[in-house]
Amino acid sequence: MNKINAAITAVGAYLPEDVITNDDLEKMVDTNDEWIMTRVGIKERRILRDKNKGASYLAIRAAQDLFDRHGIDPKSIDGLILATNSSDYHFPSTASIVAHEIGCGDIFSFDMQAACPTFIYALEVGANFIRSGRYSKILVIATEKMTAFTDYTDRATCPLFGDGAGCVLLEATEEEVGVMDAVLHSNGIGKDHLIMKAGGSACPATHETVDNRWHYVYQEGQVVFKHAVVDMCNSCVEIMERNNLSHDDITWVVPHQANLRIIDAVARRMGVPYEKVMVNIERYGNTSSATIPICLWEWEHKLKKGDVLVMTSFGAGFTWGAVYVKWAYDGSTVR
């Protein structure tokens, strides 16, 4: 039997229409456009303002975009993996809601949560389902309503986050394309540096936790920045060395869009010219696990069959890693 690979054969995304600019934030907290642009490189971010709609709504819209533009029948999907750090509820899973709403029938579906790298974790998990030979099509969706957990009185974190969703379809192939390798790491030393302190079983919601604003994202920015630069760079070098890839072999670097200075550092360490790096943080901010698939969606028409992509991310925990992908189709042919 020939080796089965897991190819990305379609991408989709959805970004809410409403925008929060740096000028808008200047009216809420003590900040300004120059301060935000200098430190993180974000000009604006999208927000899903409807309080009755959660991450599932964004995921549904992203999946529908993929189905519509690529002519995919939802009933052909074997399983759905949903990457999110902002699920609709603790239970039921957001994946089960999405699978039902997009018309996939009674397929298996589950949520994954590994902070901002959740998408690359989910991509490797989905690829292994395909490699097992038991499944032909796995839909991987990353969806985040991060603004629901953003404290708009905190000048350090409120400029960072935006809402959005992106997705990819993994399909079985015998060609030498698809998810070729992944390096995934975690280390709990960073637990207290990037955290939502309350709402889980270790610290259930009380009047005190609400009053202390512990249900919003808390981040020690300088600590997180230093670890992100080192770990994202090291994971990229690790996957390049494991697969004998030089900087000349790489067509595109797809970094997590958390901070423009981190992205710059990764590109320099890899020796890749900046024109090969996907960057859209200025317009969308940090959509957590959704940043990488949103980049793939936005660059789809530039991607060609055989292109070599290295995706890398870092997040709470700490968690980090990189994925090596050979692109499976010419994006210019997609409507």
Curated annotation (Swiss-Prot):
The cellular component terms of Gene Ontology attached to this UniProt record, alphabetical and capped at eight, are: cytoplasm
Annotated segments matching region ACP-binding: 257-261
Keyword Lipid biosynthesis belongs to the record: yes
The record places the active site at C116, H256, N286
Q: Name one Pfam family in it.
A: ACP_syn_III
Task: Please list the GO biological process terms of this entry.
Answer: fatty acid biosynthetic process; secondary metabolite biosynthetic process
Gene Ontology molecular function: any one: 3-oxoacyl-[acyl-carrier-protein] synthase activity
Which pathway features in its UniProt record?
Lipid metabolism; fatty acid biosynthesis
- Give the main localization category: cytoplasm
Please give the CDD domains that the UniProt record associates with this protein.
KAS_III (cd00830)
State whether keyword Acetylation applies.
no
To which protein family does this belong?
Answer: Belongs to the thiolase-like superfamily. FabH family.
Task performed by this protein: Catalyzes the condensation reaction of fatty acid synthesis by the addition to an acyl acceptor of two carbons from malonyl-ACP. Catalyzes the first condensation reaction which initiates fatty acid synthesis and may therefore play a role in governing the total rate of fatty acid production. Possesses both acetoacetyl-ACP synthase and acetyl transacylase activities. Its substrate specificity determines the biosynthesis of branched-chain and/or straight-chain of fatty acids.
**Oligomeric state and partners?**
Homodimer.
Q: What is this protein called?
A: Beta-ketoacyl-[acyl-carrier-protein] synthase III
Task: Please name the source species.
Answer: Porphyromonas gingivalis (strain ATCC 33277 / DSM 20709 / CIP 103683 / JCM 12257 / NCTC 11834 / 2561)
Biological classification of the source: Bacteria, Pseudomonadati, Bacteroidota, Bacteroidia, Bacteroidales
- The gene name on file is fabH
